[in-house]
Amino acid sequence: NRLTRVMMIVQDMGKQHLLQSLANTDGLTGLLNKRYFDRVLTVLEQHSQPFALFYMDLDRFKPVNDTYGHDVGDKLLKGVAQRLQGCIRSRDYAFRLGGDEFALLLLGPMTQETCARKMDMICEMIAVPYEIDGNAVSVGASCGYALYPAESVDVQQVRCIADQRMYENKQANHARQDGAEGI
């Protein structure tokens, strides 16, 4: 029967779409995953498309897991993912790279000043407490960014620059926290 064959083809297409979606997304947050991140960067580099890469690592995430448990930690990661999705345009990308590490790819040319403002806005947005299971849960974020091709035409170098800036930001955040605890 022709209708049955068409229905089977449509079902197979749906299954293929589902499998592809599962292969490209993080199962917990629904964000795109590291595998897809690597592929997008390769395509952008091959076509010399300008972008800003933001790396983000959560601060104080481990104490949340230790204090409230992994279920609350998972809900927190989902909340962070939702906030990240809310701060990008529809043409941009948000990724969970693993653990409490995230990345954003903002497509098109950008300036250092625009990136610095965006980074500050992301960090402020992530720092707003999350209401999870009746608890106000707070984390911070350390971010770093780099511009392609403005800072390097080598995507690996752009990744290193963003990672180094994130690390420096994390060190500065720890120093501020240590100073605040001493007051």
Please give the residue ranges for each predicted region:
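Hydrophobic framework residues that shape the active-site pocket
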Residues: F61, V80, A94, F102, ...
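PAS-family sensory domains
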Residues: R2-D12, I161
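Short regulatory alpha-helical coupling segments
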Residues: Q20-S21, K34-P50, A81-R89
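PAS-associated C-terminal cap
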Residues: Q11-S21
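Catalytic-core segments of nucleotide cyclases and related cyclic-nucleotide turnover enzymes
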Residues: Q16, A116-C123, A127, E131-D133, ...
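Conserved nucleotide-binding and Mg2+-coordinating catalytic segments in signaling enzymes
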Residues: Q20-R39, M56-H70, K78
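A short pre-motif secondary-structure segment
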Residues: Y93-R96, V137
